[in-house]
């Protein structure tokens, strides 16, 4: 679904573990890494799209994760001019995304990025919470920064300010 301004409705997924780390996936046959994301189909809610994309791209079912938080706003990024398909109608100039923060409830071994017939990723790993903001492709960086800032207290309740705060005994 592409809106009147040319932005495709999309969901983004941040999966965290109990150690303040997030799921980071490598795009198939590329050296670029990102969070799982994907388009919202006609008649689908953002949550339904998130669960569909989660299964298609990561091989996880709803009962294997817990939704901790959903972004308050739709966040947008523009595609670089070289990536815009000008012959496509309607023309897509970028993505508008609703983001979901999930906690993994199952074993890591249950993650299977290669399970679908058309995988988006060929590898994954856990990375430190803020790592993706520095490593994602530049045109997504602002959205990642905003998402991670918004999700920080939910993803790492004791680490949002950089670590646990200890009071000195007087």
Curated annotation (Swiss-Prot):
Signal peptide: none annotated. Residues 6-149 form the Nudix hydrolase domain. The gene is rppH. InterPro entries: Nudix_hydrolase, NUDIX_hydrolase-like_dom_sf, NUDIX_hydrolase_CS, NUDIX_hydrolase_dom, RppH. The lineage of its organism: Bacteria, Pseudomonadati, Pseudomonadota, Gammaproteobacteria, Alteromonadales. It comes from Idiomarina loihiensis (strain ATCC BAA-735 / DSM 15497 / L2-TR). Belongs to the Nudix hydrolase family. RppH subfamily. This is RNA pyrophosphohydrolase. Accelerates the degradation of transcripts by removing pyrophosphate from the 5'-end of triphosphorylated RNA, leading to a more labile monophosphorylated state that can stimulate subsequent ribonuclease cleavage. Its cofactor is a divalent metal cation.
């Amino acid at each position: 679904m592409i809106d009147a301004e040319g932005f495709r409705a999309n969901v983004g997924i941040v999966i965290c573990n109990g150690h303040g780390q997030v799921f980071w996936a490598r795009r198939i046959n590329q050296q670029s890494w990102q969070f799982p994301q994907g388009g919202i189909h006609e008649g689908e809610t953002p949550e339904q799209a998130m669960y569909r994309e989660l299964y298609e791209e990561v091989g996880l079912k709803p009962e294997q994760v817990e939704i901790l938080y959903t972004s308050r706003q739709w966040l947008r990024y523009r595609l670089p001019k070289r990536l815009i398909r000008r012959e496509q109608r309607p023309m897509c100039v970028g993505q508008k995304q609703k983001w979901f923060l999930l906690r993994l409830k199952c074993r890591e071994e249950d993650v299977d990025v290669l399970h679908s017939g058309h995988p988006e990723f060929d590898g994954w790993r856990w990375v430190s919470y803020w790592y993706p903001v520095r490593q994602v492709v530049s045109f997504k960086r602002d959205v990642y920064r905003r998402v991670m800032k918004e999700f920080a207290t939910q993803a790492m309740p004791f680490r949002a300010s950089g670590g646990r705060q200890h009071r000195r005994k007087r």
